[in-house]
Amino acid sequence: MQDIYIGDEGKGIPLVLVHGFLGSSRMWEPQIDFFKDYFRVITPDLPGYGKSNQTKSHNNIQSITNLLLDCLEEKKIDKFYLLGHSMGGMIVQEMAKKSGDKISKLVCYSTGPRGEMPGRFETVDQSRENLKKKGLEITAKNIAKTWFIKGEDAKYFDICIEAGKQTSMETADNSLVAIKNWNGVDTLKNIKNETLIVWGDQD
């Protein structure tokens, strides 16, 4: 099993927060500060991201899913609340399909049931092409701007930029391949957990 960084703060029922494309556990700092008084907050850095940036990245959602489930099992976390953002939302959907009995409640935040979502600001292939043309830093900045109504002026924009800078070109491209090739529509019916879907009206 790969060794990845997993933040672990607070006490109580575990709350697992899974970041998305060009993210890291740092993005959850405001949530950690709030929720650690009520939950044991678990924040993994996915392979190739954040403090796991020396770990080989994956190019499919299923393998990341399996890794996270294995890591949680190793930490003896067998019942938890689960939230995923964007690509992380794809991962948590697969976690719920595979190990739904371990998940108390599920939150899908700014995500969908397939990687190539209609209405995305650009196709995944365009994202891959822009990554190659513009490089990681500009791509990370452009992606992070889409996460906030205020764009670069948002309070936590800089945290997101720093997270993106810790990623390699290979990891970023592998993640885009994983997103493009993932489609969970046909297996949505396998999610039996009580689920909250959070989708901003300007997303």
Indicate where each model-derived feature is located.
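Active-site loop/oxyanion-hole signature of alpha/beta-hydrolase fold enzymes
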Residues: P30-D33, I42-L83
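Gly/Ala-rich beta-loop-alpha elbow adjacent to hydrolase catalytic centers
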Residues: G84-G88, V92
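Flexible "cap/lid" loop of the alpha/beta hydrolase fold
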Residues: Q93-K98, I103-K134, I138
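Conserved alpha/beta-hydrolase catalytic His-Asp/Glu region
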Residues: E116-E122, K133-K189
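Short beta-strand/loop motif that positions the catalytic acidic residue
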Residues: I191, I197-W199, D203
